[in-house]
Amino acid sequence: MLSRSRCVSRAFSRSLSAFQKGNCPLGRRSLPGISLCQGPGYPDSRKIVISNSSVLNVRFFRTTAVCKDDVITVKTPAFAESVTEGDVRWEKAVGDTVAEDEVVCEIETDKTSVQVPSPANGVIEALLVPDGGKVEGGTPLFTLRKTGAAPAKAKPAEAPAAAAPKAEPAVSAVPPPPAASIPTQMPPVPSPPQPLTSKPVSAVKPTAAPPVAEPGAVKGLRAEHREKMNRMRQRIAQRLKEAQNTCAMLTTFNEIDMSNIQDMRARHKEAFLKKHNLKLGFMSAFVKASAFALQEQPVVNAVIDDTTKEVVYRDYIDISVAVATPRGLVVPVIRNVETMNYADIERTISELGEKARKNELAIEDMDGGTFTISNGGVFGSLFGTPIINPPQSAILGMHAIVDRPVAVGGKVEIRPMMYVALTYDHRLIDGREAVTFLRKIKAAVEDPRVLLLDL
C-alpha cells in the first residue's frame, strides 16, 4: 500500500511539472483521462482515472518543518552553594504571549525569590513543572516558541459608525395642550382645626419588635483560614530553632546616651547629603562601632565548627543587617566593614534596603556574615533579646530612642537613651568578653572621637 501511494505521488508530480512547462499535450486545454500507477512493475495495481476536465490553475503546496531553534527550553538558573532547591510559582500559563525579559515564573528559595524571565519574544508552549513544584538548579522549567517581534497590545476595535437617519417630515408626537378653562366655582374654604382626641393607653396597640437574628445565622465572626508557609518562613523557623537547640544563648544589656550622635547628625546631615547624596542615619554609627569592637574582641567574630570541633577565627568583618519585608526577615550582608567609612556604609545600606523592598535581593547578597545587627527600635521596641543568626556567634539588638531622666554629674537630666542587647553563644564567648564588647560599642557611639583616636 505504501509503494502504491509513493507511485501515485511521483506520477502526479511529474504530470504537474509537465503541465507547468507546457510540454504535455494533456495540459493544453482539456484532459481526456490520466492513468496513474499502471505498469508491469505493479501487477496488482488498479487503474486510477481522472475524469475529463479543464485545467484552469495548478497550485503547489508544501509543508514547512518547524525549526528546532524556534522552540527553546528554559531551565532553572544556578543557585548558590547554600541553596539546593526552590518552589515554583507561575506568573504565566500555556499559550500566553511574552516579551523578552518578561517574568514567567518566580522560584522561592530558603533565602530569597529568584525571577525567571523569558529569554526572547514568543509563546509559552508547555510548563514542565507544576505550580508549587520543587526544582533544582538546571531543571527544565518551560518551553518557548520564539516569534519575531514583541507582542503588541491589542487595539480596541473601532465601533462602526451609526447610519445617518433618513430625513423625514417633522411630525408632532405630542398633541397640543387644551386651552385652560376658567373656573366657575369658588374654591372650598378650609375648616378650622379640631382639638386632638386622646385615646386610653390600653387602646394603643404596641408596635411589634423587629425579629432578633439567631446566633447561628451570623456568619464570619469566628471564622479561620489556613495558609501554607512559604519556603522562606519555613527556613527562618528552622534556623531559629536550630540556633536555640545548638547555641548556649545568653544576653547582656546596656544603655547608650544618644545625645552626641544626635548632635553630630543634626550639625552635619545637610553637608553630608550635599557631598554624598545620602542621608546620615544612626545605623552607620552602630555598624562602624560594631566593626571597631569586633577588631578588639575577635572571639565575637569567630564561630564553632561542630563537625571538626574547632574554632574558626575570621580576619574579615561582614555584618548582616536585618531587614523586615512582607515575605519575612532577610539579612543582607555589608562586607569588609572594617575598610569602610560612614558614607560607604550608608550607601551600601541604602542599596541593599532598596533591593529588599523591591524583592530583588540575590542569594549572594545574603550569603555569609560574621555578625548581625537587628534594629527593633524602628517598630517602637523598647527592650528585647534577639536570637543568634547561625552560623554566627553573636547578635546586637538596637531599640527605640526614648527621653529618660538619667544622672549626669550628680544631677538629673533628660537624655535620649537607647537600650541595647547582645545575645552571644556562651559555649565560645565568656561573659567578660561579651560585656567588654558591648561597652566598646557604647563608647564608640556616645563619642565617635574614640574611633578616630583608636581608643
From Swiss-Prot:
GO terms for cellular component: mitochondrial matrix; mitochondrion; nucleus; oxoglutarate dehydrogenase complex. Residues 153-173 have a biased composition (Low complexity). Residues 153-214 are annotated as: Disordered. The modification N6-acetyllysine is found at K155, K269, K274, K275, K279, K309. The keyword Acetylation applies. Residues 1-68 form a transit peptide. Pfam families: 2-oxoacid_dh, Biotin_lipoyl. It is an enzyme of class 2 (transferase). One of its GO terms (molecular function) is dihydrolipoyllysine-residue succinyltransferase activity. It comes from the Eukaryota. Its cofactor is (R)-lipoate. The active site is at H426, D430. Pathway: Amino-acid degradation; L-lysine degradation via saccharopine pathway; glutaryl-CoA from L-lysine: step 6/6; Carbohydrate metabolism; tricarboxylic acid cycle. It catalyses: N(6)-[(R)-dihydrolipoyl]-L-lysyl-[protein] + succinyl-CoA = N(6)-[(R)-S(8)-succinyldihydrolipoyl]-L-lysyl-[protein] + CoA. One of its GO terms (biological process) is L-lysine catabolic process to acetyl-CoA via saccharopine. PROSITE patterns: BIOTINYL_LIPOYL, LIPOYL. Residues 221-453 are annotated as: Catalytic. InterPro entries: 2-oxoA_DH_lipoyl-BS, 2-oxoacid_dehydrogenase, 2-oxoacid_DH_actylTfrase, Biotin_lipoyl, CAT-like_dom_sf, Single_hybrid_motif, SucB. Its EC number is 2.3.1.61. It is found in: Mitochondrion matrix; Nucleus. Residues 174-195 have a biased composition (Pro residues). Residues 71-145 form the Lipoyl-binding domain. The 2-oxoglutarate dehydrogenase complex is composed of OGDH (2-oxoglutarate dehydrogenase; E1), DLST (dihydrolipoamide succinyltransferase; E2), DLD (dihydrolipoamide dehydrogenase; E3) and the assembly factor KGD4. It contains multiple copies of the three enzymatic components (E1, E2 and E3). In the nucleus, the 2-oxoglutarate dehydrogenase complex associates with KAT2A. Interacts with ABHD11; this interaction maintains the functional lipoylation of the 2-oxoglutarate dehydrogenase complex. This is Dihydrolipoyllysine-residue succinyltransferase component of 2-oxoglutarate dehydrogenase complex, mitochondrial. The gene is DLST.
